[in-house]
């Protein structure tokens, strides 16, 4: 039997930290370091019988947040990708192997929105997270093939 070569390899990068994940519904062109705490202020928790809402100001704009827990036995991972393209030894027919290193993990996602909390049907970002969770439940991966 021919050995199967993975296209993507997932590695643990030392000890991964448990982080807070946030999803902002906006485009930010800057991709360098940023002093986030200089611009992210006034965290307020408002709770009633049905919802818990977090309100913050980011550079003068009010954002409303809703925290979603990942399902039991699920862990979110922030990965850094090394696509392996700098290796000139691979032929054109050979697909280069990418290595993804787990940088940190998360168990909850804070969804931020400029509007008040909306239902899943109206909020494309919340719907997207819920769809990814459903998708993840259908994906199976046999790690023993690559050991």
Swiss-Prot record:
GO biological process, one term: removal of RNA primer involved in mitotic DNA replication
Alphabetized CDD domains for the sequence: RNase_H2-C
Pfam families: RNase_H2_suC
Gene Ontology CC, one term: cytosol
Entry-linked InterPro entries: RNase_H2_suC
Name the record gives this protein: Uncharacterized protein C12B10.15c
Organism: Schizosaccharomyces pombe (strain 972 / ATCC 24843) (Fission yeast)
